[in-house]
Amino acid sequence: MYTSFEERLSLVKKCSEGSLAFYQKIPGAVHLEGNGWELISSDSRFAMFNGILIHSARKDLVDEVIAVLAKHDIPSDIRLIGPGISQLNALEGHGYKNLGSNPFMVWSADNSVDNFQLQDHLTVRRLDQNDIRTAADIYMDVYRMSEDVVKDMKRMFCVSQNDHTYGLFKDNEMVSIVTAMVYRDSVGIWSMGTPTKHQKNGYGRELLMHVMQSHKNMGAKEFFLYASSAGKFLYDKCGWLTLDYLPYLSKS
């Protein structure tokens, strides 16, 4: 399954293409592709919201990428895949630090979710702009984001019809949140989080399984996500497969 580099790259790029919907209402957003690299920028001063994917060992590629970032005045974090990993030393020479490798995971829709039933005391609702403050509070708690970072993130919250952001509720309190970005017959999972005080209650699993089941029933065939070390156990438990480990570099 997805054993070749070309297959893995195709899925990573499909996930990236789906994420473009986050930026559709940001006037200064940038999407550029070069020979062996791709830049997607939300016009944020925070590099975590601007990303470059490098997938080639081409000579002079890093200098080209650095020049593009300087031209557009964009701070950007970088992911490497396949032959692109050979560019690590060159990027470190430009001040980037390797923060480790993040799992890129996939779930191919199957019948493993068909019998899932949400616990009786829980409900799920698709969120909208009216939920932005509650969502922001959860992101600040889970990801330790500052108000300034969350301010930039708000520009990408529920701005597209393809953005299916869901909240899991217990007694009218949101106890978990996740974004499912629909793209063709695929779904990218982003920004999943459960407030600290509600963790270790299985809420993340309940919400993720509900989303997997719901979007499978809507016709989705492939689901993608980048896992954190903390979240990977949950995704493993829900039947996701690790497709690759992508080095993640940042100056911040």
Predicted regions and their residues:
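A conserved beta-turn-beta hairpin within the catalytic core of GNAT-like acetyltransferases
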Residues: 45-50, 99, 181-190, 199
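N-terminal charged segments
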Residues: 1-72
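A short, well-structured alpha-helix characteristic of acyl/acetyltransferase catalytic modules
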Residues: 129-141
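A conserved beta-strand-loop-helix scaffold within acyl/acetyltransferase catalytic domains
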Residues: 146-195
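Acyl-donor-binding surface of acyltransferase catalytic domains
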Residues: 56-122, 225, 249-251
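Conserved active-site alpha-helix within GNAT-family acetyltransferase domains
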Residues: 85-98, 205, 229-245
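Conserved acetyl-CoA-binding loop-helix of GNAT-fold acetyltransferases
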Residues: 59-66, 194, 200-213
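Conserved N-terminal entry element of GNAT/NAT acetyltransferase domains
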Residues: 2-5, 31-35, 109-129
